[in-house]
UniProtKB/Swiss-Prot annotation:
GO terms for molecular function: lyase activity; nickel cation binding. HAMAP family: LarC. The gene is larC. It catalyses: Ni(II)-pyridinium-3,5-bisthiocarboxylate mononucleotide = pyridinium-3,5-bisthiocarboxylate mononucleotide + Ni(2+). InterPro entries: Ni_insertion. This is Pyridinium-3,5-bisthiocarboxylic acid mononucleotide nickel insertion protein. Disulfide bonds: none annotated. NCBIfam families: nickel pincer cofactor biosynthesis protein LarC (TIGR00299). Belongs to the LarC family. One of its GO terms (biological process) is protein maturation. Pfam families: Ni_insertion (PF01969). Keywords: Lyase, Nickel.
Length: 394
C-alpha cells in the first residue's frame, strides 16, 4: 500500500494528522501514545468541518497544563526516549525533531542541540508530530510520496518579529524538494504562511518520492482541514491511500552514481558507504574490480533520488580520491512492503514483509533488532533468530 500526501494547498502538522485519521488511523490509539509522551497534558479531538465546500476533519489539540513553549531539543528527546510507545513511532518522532533542530540551527547559527523551540516546542506541536508518526505506523504504507509543497508568500508575525514567508526554518527544510507559492489564480495578493515547519519536516522525514499522485487503485482519501476557511481554495491536506500491486508496482526512477577508485586506503571504505547513506543515498555498495595493468581497485556505487544527486556527489568526491563520477537514470522495481512486530522474550523484533500481487514473497527480520535483543538477553544472534515465532506473515 502507498500513501500520497497532497500539500498543494500547504501543510501543517495538525492538518496532516487530521487527514491520516480520516484515512483510517485510530484516534484512540494515537491519544494513548501522545498521553505516554506528555501525560495528562493534551487531549486530541476531531471535528467535521467544511472548507470552501470541501468536507474535512479538523483536529483540535487541547493543551491542559501548558506552561511554556521554549523547550530544548534535549528535553523533547528525553520525553520521547522515556515514553513507553512503539519503537518505530519513537524513532520517527526523534528524526522529525532532529530535522527541525538542524534547520533552526542553520537559521540561528548555533548547534542543533542548543536550539530551544518556540511554537514547535509547545505541547500541541509535540502532539502533532508524535501523532502523525503513530498514525503512519498504524497505516503502515510501503511507499510514501508527496506533492510539491505550497509555501505561501508575504510576511507574518512570529516569535522573532515580522518575518518573510517562507519562514527561515521552512526555507531550510524544503531544500531539494519541489515547491510552489500556492497563490490563487489571477491574484497577486499575499496568501501568508501555507506550510509550517512541523508540516514540512514531517513530509521530509517520511516521503521518499515527490511529484503528482503516483497512480494505482485508491482505497481511502483522508481530508485534514486547517483553521482558516480561505476564500477561493479549500484549506486542506489530503492523505490518499492506494494499492500499487496490480496496476502500478513500486517502481522508482533513480540516478545511479559510480566511480572507480584504485588509490584509496581500504580501511576507509566502510565509512564511505555510511557517508553516502547519510548524504541521502537510497542504496550504496562496493565492488572489487581490476583496472588497467591489473591494478586491484574498487567500484563505489550509489542509487539516489534525483533531489539528492548533488548532495551525494559532493559527499562521494569528499570521501574518496576519485576525480570523476559517472551517472545515469535507472528504474528500480520493489516489492510492496509492510512491517509486522513479534516479541522475543520481551524484546520487539520488526519483520519486513515483501509482497507482489497480494502474495508474500519475502519476510526478513530487521538485524539491528536481533542484535539489540541478543545483547540484552546475553545470547547469540543465531539463538534470537531461532526464537522468532514462525508464521508471522500468515
Amino acid at each position: 500500500m502507498g500513501l500520497w500526501i497532497d500539500a498543494t494547498a500547504g501543510v501543517a502538522g495538525d492538518m496532516l494528522l487530521g487527514a491520516l485519521i480520516d484515512a483510517g488511523a485510530e484516534l484512540e490509539k494515537i491519544q494513548q501514545v501522545v498521553e505516554a509522551v506528555i501525560p495528562g497534558d493534551v487531549l486530541l479531538r476531531t471535528e467535521e468541518v467544511v472548507r470552501q465546500g470541501q468536507r474535512g476533519i479538523k483536529l483540535h489539540v487541547d493543551a491542559q497544563h501548558e506552561h511554556h513553549h521554549h523547550r530544548h531539543l534535549s528535553t523533547i528527546k528525553e520525553l520521547l526516549v522515556n515514553a513507553d510507545i512503539p519503537e518505530q513511532t519513537k524513532q520517527d518522532a526523534l528524526g522529525v525533531f532532529e530535522l527541525i533542530a538542524i534547520a533552526e540551527g542553520k537559521v540561528h547559527g548555533i548547534e542543533p542541540e542548543k536550539i530551544h523551540f518556540h511554537e514547535v516546542g509547545a505541547w500541541d506541536s509535540i502532539a502533532d508530530i508524535v501523532g502523525v508518526c503513530e498514525a503512519i505506523r498504524q497505516l503502515n504504507p510501503g511507499l510514501i510520496a508527496a506533492s510539491p509543497i505550497a509555501l505561501g508568500f508575504g510576511r507574518i508575525k512570529a516569535a522573532h518579529g515580522d518575518i518573510p514567508v517562507p519562514v527561515p526554518a521552512v526555507a531550510e527544510l524544503v531544500k531539494g524538494w519541489p515547491t510552489q507559492t500556492g497563490a490563487l489564480m489571477e491574484s497577486t495578493e499575499p496568501v501568508g504562511e501555507l506550510a509550517t515547519p512541523t508540516g514540512v519536516a514531517l513530509i521530509r522525514h517520511f516521503a521518499t518520492q515527490d511529484g503528482p499522485f503516483p497512480g494505482g487503485i485508491i482505497n481511502e482519501v483522508g481530508i485534514g482541514a486547517g483553521t482558516k476557511d480561505t476564500e477561493g481554495r479549500p484549506n486542506i491536506v489530503r492523505a490518499i491511500l492506494f494499492n500499487t500491486s496490480r496496476s502500478n508496482p513500486d517502481t522508482r526512477t533513480l540516478v545511479q552514481l559510480e566511480a572507480n577508485v584504485d588509490d584509496q586506503d581500504p580501511r576507509l571504505w566502510p565509512g564511505v558507504i555510511e557517508i553516502l547513506f547519510a548524504a541521502g543515498a537510497v542504496d550504496a555498495w562496493l565492488t572489487p574490480i581490476l583496472m588497467k595493468k591489473g591494478r586491484p581497485a574498487h567500484r563505489v556505487s550509489a542509487l539516489v533520488d534525483s533531489s539528492e544527486v548533488e548532495a551525494v556527489k559532493t559527499a562521494l568526491f569528499a570521501a574518496t580520491t576519485t576525480f570523476g563520477i559517472r551517472s545515469w537514470e535507472v528504474e528500480r522495481e520493489g516489492l510492496d512492503r509492510r512491517f509486522e512486530q513479534v516479541e522475543v522474550d520481551g524484546h520487539t523484533i520488526n519483520i519486513k514483509i515483501g509482497s507482489r500481487d497480494d502474495q508474500v514473497i519475502s519476510a526478513q527480520s530487521e538485524f539491528e533488532d536481533i542484535r539489540s535483543a541478543a545483547v540484552a538477553l546475553g545470547i547469540s544472534e543465531r539463538e534470537v533468530v531461532a526464537r522468532i515465532p514462525q508464521g508471522t506473515t500468515e
